[in-house]
Amino acid sequence: MEIMESGDPVIQWDRKLSELSEAAESDSLYNNTPFSELLDDSALLDVLGQLMGDPFLTEKYEMMEVEMNPSSPSPMIKAEHSYSLCGDSRPQSPFTHASSDDNFSDTDLTGDDWCLNGELTATTPTTKIKVEIPLEETPGLTPSVTLATSAVSASPEVGVSSQLPVPEQVKLLSPVALPQIKLEPHEVDQFLNLCPKEVAPTEALQMPPTPPSSHGSDSEGGQSPTRSLPPSSPVQSQAGGKMAARSPSALSNSPLLTAPHKLQGSGPLMLTEEEKRTLVAEGYPIPTKLPLTKAEEKALKKIRRKIKNKISAQESRRKKKEYMDSLEKRVENSSSENSELRKKVEVLESTNRTLLQQLQRLQAMVTGKVTRSCKAAGTQTGTCLMMVVLCFAVIFGSFTQNLDMYSSSSKTIHEPSQYSAPESYAASIVRSRKLLIFEEHQAVEELHSSAVMLETQDTWEVQADTISKQQAALLEELHLSQEKPFSLSNDSSSDMPVRHRFTSEFGHNDTTKVIELDRTVNTTS
């Protein structure tokens, strides 16, 4: 027995599904179709009679305690069974096969344990109590009862009435807080149902389902647990609600299993070949008529569970094989794309190499042209500079020849004065002298002609002799002039100039030069 406190989000625990789900998510599975439209009065009485008159509910379990919230409104009755998605046109209920011969009395309906209301509406989530009966002690179609006061919104999957035609034998004991009855028959065919909360995550993840495992609920005829991810957003919950209207699973329409409604009621029992073969293999007798005994029902449930496990395992292997095939195709496509990309890379590398080679060739050609143009420009500038230097040398050479000619003539003329200069400053008194040179008209012409005529070594020797003679004559004249006394006076007075005549021979020509020396001695008193 599980009790959920009010005020928190109601979480329903389903022993068959082994999963947690929000109440708002499970509410989308039910609709507001009146239960009276699905069952007539006699069928409703049969359902309530079997529910209330079951000896295991009255003997084994004590009175169920329901903790109700006084502020919560009356809940609505919700019935849920596993064969609502079967191929049969009418909705199947686990209690429609029950006959009116079952024990049904007013005392069973007047107990304080059961409270029903004709108009049940729930607005706030409150306490939920769920009771499940073990299979070993119950008949094959004994339901598990869930009492809850949670707010429920219905879907077209399972017909649950919000307005129930209640028989006269039913008493309304607590009009304020009434429990919600959830019928969950523990039939083996519950495994055939599709839960939208299971379908949505598997389709979202696109992963192969795992085969059902041997869980504790399997031994009781329940569905093997399948864990599903809780919805992370309202979009996923809406998708789960839409998936509830899908077609039933291949297991529910499998020809290997007998339809659930054929196992109800009375009459001959027609089992499938797979069920008969499995029963014989397990060593159980094959039942041929209804209703089934407890041993036959237990054996049939076990066999049907094995067949369903086999079918689900085959389906799982098939989906896994499809998934692996898709993965192999993806690997093949990826490998082919990888090889194509490698080929493209190789082509691009070869193209890059050729382009680099062409670039190097172009660079070499450009550098060769540049060096040739630079060499040509260098040779042109060098030629121009050489021409300029040559012209300058020619001009400068002609100018220096003229200067040499005049300098040689001046040296020959002024040479005696160089020897007389130190003699004139030898005296202790201040002296001023003045050298006057008188040349005849033909002196320059003779000097020029003598410079041109000197070509051989003999002429140079003759000139050297004449020069030495002239120097000796000049020295004698200087000695004679120094021996002459000077006159001392305050005013400048000039004596008669002393004239010396000497003859110098240049070549075969005689040149007469008159050198007049004026000496004036100024004496300061």
Curated annotation (Swiss-Prot):
Protein name stated in the entry: Cyclic AMP-responsive element-binding protein 3-like protein 2
Chain ranges of the bZIP domain: 299-362
Amino acid composition bias (Polar residues), ranges on this chain: 90-102, 213-239
Residues carrying covalently attached carbohydrate according to the record: 490, 509, 522
Region (Leucine-zipper): 341-362
Motif (S1P recognition): 433-436
Composition bias, Basic and acidic residues: 322-332
Main location: endoplasmic reticulum
Key words of the record: Activator, Developmental protein, DNA-binding, Endoplasmic reticulum, Glycoprotein, Membrane, Nucleus, Signal-anchor, Transcription, Transcription regulation, Transmembrane, Transmembrane helix, Unfolded protein response
Stored InterPro entries: bZIP (IPR004827), bZIP_sf (IPR046347)
BP-aspect Gene Ontology terms: cartilage development; chondrocyte differentiation; regulation of transcription by RNA polymerase II; response to endoplasmic reticulum stress; response to unfolded protein
Family: Belongs to the bZIP family. ATF subfamily.
